[in-house]
């Protein structure tokens, strides 16, 4: 192991729940406005998870007032307070980019039993 691997190991978080594409999650993000810090919740469907180790990221998509909003988060970011898994989705793909074109009921994901 080289020095970078030791730094990466020290920066990894162990409080991240297991989630995968298709799951609906709440991401509690720390937002700094001026001198104040508050928690903002971003709720949506995980459409991708990529990378590994300290560089791992995931993308969450939601509809806000009829506009699709996607946000990419590093999994081990200190700006993430915590992550809650709301529902588990039953999908057959690792990348759910096709959800970008779907609207309404067609964009619904079946829930795992």
From Swiss-Prot:
Membrane-spanning ranges: none
Keyword annotations: Ribonucleoprotein, Ribosomal protein
Molecular function terms from GO: structural constituent of ribosome
One GO-annotated biological process of the protein: translation
One GO location term (cellular component): cytosolic large ribosomal subunit
Signal peptide: none
UniProt entry tagged with the keyword Cell inner membrane: no
Pfam family, any one: Ribosomal_L19
Domain of life (superkingdom): Bacteria
PANTHER family hit by this protein: LARGE RIBOSOMAL SUBUNIT PROTEIN BL19M, RIBOSOMAL PROTEIN L19
Similarity field: Belongs to the bacterial ribosomal protein bL19 family.
Primary role: This protein is located at the 30S-50S ribosomal subunit interface and may play a role in the structure and function of the aminoacyl-tRNA binding site.
Name of this chain's protein: Large ribosomal subunit protein bL19
């Amino acid at each position: 192991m080289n020095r970078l691997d030791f730094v990466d190991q020290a920066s990894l978080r162990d409080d991240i729940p297991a989630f995968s594409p298709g799951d609906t999650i709440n991401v509690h993000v720390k937002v700094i406005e001026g001198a104040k810090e508050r928690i903002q919740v971003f709720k949506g469907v995980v459409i991708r998870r990529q990378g590994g180790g300290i560089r791992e990221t995931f993308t969450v998509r939601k509809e806000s007032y009829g506009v699709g909003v996607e946000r990419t988060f590093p999994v081990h970011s200190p700006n993430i307070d915590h992550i809650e898994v709301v529902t588990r989705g039953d999908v057959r793909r690792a990348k759910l980019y096709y959800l970008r074109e779907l609207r309404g009921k067609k964009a619904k994901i079946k829930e795992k039993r």
